[in-house]
Swiss-Prot record:
NCBIfam families: ATP_synt_delta. One of its GO terms (molecular function) is proton-transporting ATP synthase activity, rotational mechanism. The keyword Metal-binding does not apply. Belongs to the ATPase delta chain family. This is ATP synthase subunit delta. One of its GO terms (cellular component) is proton-transporting ATP synthase complex. F(1)F(0) ATP synthase produces ATP from ADP in the presence of a proton or sodium gradient. F-type ATPases consist of two structural domains, F(1) containing the extramembraneous catalytic core and F(0) containing the membrane proton channel, linked together by a central stalk and a peripheral stalk. During catalysis, ATP synthesis in the catalytic domain of F(1) is coupled via a rotary mechanism of the central stalk subunits to proton translocation. The gene is atpH.
Length: 180
C-alpha cells in the first residue's frame, strides 16, 4: 500500500462507515464528486487550506464559510475533522480514496474515455456497453476527457486494459506499416 493510501484509507473508510450507517451512500458519493470538482476548480482554496501558516481555527472558519450551505452536515463535519487533525491538505486524496473504496465495495469499474471531441449521450451509452462487455463488470462509472490530438475516435482505459480506437493511433499504425 503506498504511503499516501496508508494515511487516506482510514479517513475514507470512516466516512464510508458513517454514510453507510445513515443510509446516505449515493447522496454522499454525489456530494463528494461535486466537492472534488469545486476544489479542483479553485486550486487556491486547496493551497490556502494546506497552508501550515494558517491556524486550525481559521481553516475551520473558511470551511464553514465556503461549504456550510453547499454540502450536508456529515461531510461538513468530516472536513472540520480533517482540519482539526491537520489532514485538510490531503482532502482531495482522501475523497478520491473514498470514491475508490465505494467503487470496490459496489463492484463498479472506473473507465476513463478520452475523445477528440465531446461525446454525445448516445455515444457514451454505446461506449459504456462495449466497456462493460470487455471489462466483465455489471456497473461502470465513466469519466470523459477531451484530447484534440486524437483527431477522432476515442481511447478508453479500465484498470490495466486500454482500448485505442483513435484516428491518431490508426494513422500511426498505417505509417508504421508503410515504412516497412
Amino acid at each position: 500500500m503506498p504511503l499516501l493510501n496508508s494515511v487516506t484509507t482510514p479517513y475514507a473508510e470512516a466516512l464510508l462507515q458513517v454514510v453507510n450507517e445513515n443510509d446516505q451512500t449515493e447522496e454522499m458519493v454525489n456530494e463528494v464528486k461535486q466537492l472534488l470538482t469545486l476544489i479542483n476548480d479553485a486550486p487556491e482554496l486547496e493551497k490556502t487550506l494546506s497552508s501550515p501558516v494558517l491556524e486550525t481555527e481559521t481553516k475551520r472558519k473558511i470551511i464553514i464559510e465556503i461549504f456550510s450551505d453547499r454540502i450536508n452536515s456529515s461531510l461538513l463535519n468530516f472536513l472540520k475533522l480533517l482540519a482539526d487533525r491537520q489532514r485538510i491538505g490531503i482532502v482531495t486524496s482522501i475523497l478520491n480514496r473514498f470514491l475508490e473504496i465505494h467503487r470496490e465495495n459496489s463492484n463498479i469499474a472506473l473507465a476513463t474515455v478520452t475523445s477528440a471531441v465531446e461525446l454525445t449521450d448516445d455515444q457514451k451509452g454505446l461506449i459504456t456497453k462495449k466497456i462493460i462487455n470487455i471489462a466483465g463488470t455489471e456497473k461502470l462509472e465513466l469519466v470523459t476527457k477531451i484530447d484534440p490530438s486524437l483527431i477522432g475516435g476515442f481511447v478508453a482505459s479500465v484498470g490495466s486494459k486500454v482500448i485505442d480506437a483513435s484516428l491518431a493511433s490508426q494513422i500511426r499504425k498505417l505509417g508504421l506499416s508503410l515504412s516497412k
